[in-house]
Amino acid sequence: YKEDFHKIVSVVGGGGKTTVIRAMLRECMENSDGRIPCAVSTTTHIQKTNAEYFLGEPSMKMFRKKLSDYEAVWMGREIRKGKLASFQKEFLEEVSREPVLLLLEADGAKHFPVKAPAEHEPVICEKTGIVLNVYGMRAIGKKIKDVCFRIGEVEKILGKTGEDILRPEDIMTLALSRSAGRKCVTDEM
């Protein structure tokens, strides 16, 4: 990590994205070589946190204060109890110019461990440097219809039905598909 490091990580895929983001944030805050300034937000929706580093309004002044105080910011506008939506794109762009690792939840899965995206998904920020695709491995061995979000898309990509059992190779197929795990991902990401 360097002072001039500017990186955006967009997290997409099935259920577990927020858990992965929380773990990454914790690693940044507990790094033995010194904390890595980190901000968390979304281009879609994400769970709210009650931590003191939560930012509920798009203010660069407050963003910088929280980052200075905690070296972490979890941000978004509350749309219902416990759920956040993204701030305006312009605010996220301004945040991305700060010396901070920006972790963005960029997809929704309604808590299903596996998914294939709809036409409008995922919502990956164009300045993203890394796309992290999450799949819940607890889905393996279960019927596709019971563990997959956007089942029609999953069936089409896998050439299977909802009654079929999800296998490890199915997750690999989804992860590598330009219609699923690699959708909207450029070679630079």
Short names for language-model regions:
Residues G13-T19, H45-I46, G108-K110:
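Gly/Ser/Thr-rich loops at beta-strand to alpha-helix junctions
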Residues D69-V73, R97-L102, I130:
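Loop/turn-to-beta-strand initiation segments
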Residues V11, C38-T42, W74-R77, L102-A106, ...:
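General beta-strand structural signal in soluble alpha/beta enzymes
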Residues L25-G82:
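N-terminal phosphate/diphosphate-binding loop that engages ATP/GTP or pyrophosphate donors
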Residues Y1-M29:
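Walker A (P-loop) phosphate-binding motif
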Residues F5-K7, G34-P37, E98-V100, G129, ...:
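Short coil/turn segments at beta-strand junctions that form active-site/ligand-binding loops
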Residues G82-Q88, E93-R97, D107-M189:
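Conserved catalytic-core segment of NTP-binding enzymes
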Residues V20-I21, N50-A51, K115:
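A short acidic (Asp/Glu
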